[in-house]
Amino acid sequence: MTKSALEAELLRCGLRRYWQAAQVYVRNAVTLTAQVVDEVPFGRSHLGGAADLPLDWAWPMRGDTPLSLVAQINFADCQGFDMNSVLPERGMLYFFYDCVDGGWGSEPQDRDGFRVWFYDGDRAFLLRRYAPEGWNFPAAALQCGRRWEIPDRECWLMRDYWWEDFENVAWWERWDKFTGEKRHKLLGHSDNIQGAMELQCQLASHGIPYRAATVSQLEESFTAGAADWLLLLQIDSDDRCGMHWHGNGRLYVWMRRQDLAARDFSRCWVVLQSA
């Protein structure tokens, strides 16, 4: 969706005032369309299936439990779709998740329930690895596209926006239905199910349980860092891949803008939301 088409659709839905407030935060998203296949070509972007890992990397575990591969992204596949050149031009992103007890991302210990790895070395040193039996999803190839997006109504950026009653109706009955397709993507804005996540990432990643934060921990000097968090990857529930995140939820991989610029994926944070 182009910016002009985005504006036109918001106006058609009766959200002119929201567009006027949110247009400064419009971001480009790299959409990821899944197509189930028997075997994904080596080194290509996909959901589920096998991981093309460096030779000396072991399959990630949480104790005795193997993590499941949720997504492998070859950033070279994204070239031409990342309009602001935010992502690396090359390299592999791997996202693994504990499908037994991965947590919601609100507690510091939830860090053990996921792995986000980045490899930008020689492709010749990659080897296809399969998860232990019973711990993998059906493979689905990913095709990249692009669209422009406005912030979700409950995101950190729009926390001070005052919603009129008619705008609430317009959002849920018109806009949300218009954008209701499966939403796998890189970048853009998160499609929230249970509210904003930026502050949750800021707190939990710094060792502070989100629901138990004290008044002093919520002081502006610390919470200001919530604005640094960007959506890196969003994976929706998808019957085609056998992915059902606590029913019909979504997984969100977040990282700070300065970490993305430095290509430091070790500090990502993962949140699970479900209706």
Regions found by a protein language model. Give the residues of each.
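Preference for intrinsically disordered or flexible, low-complexity segments
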Residues: M1-A275
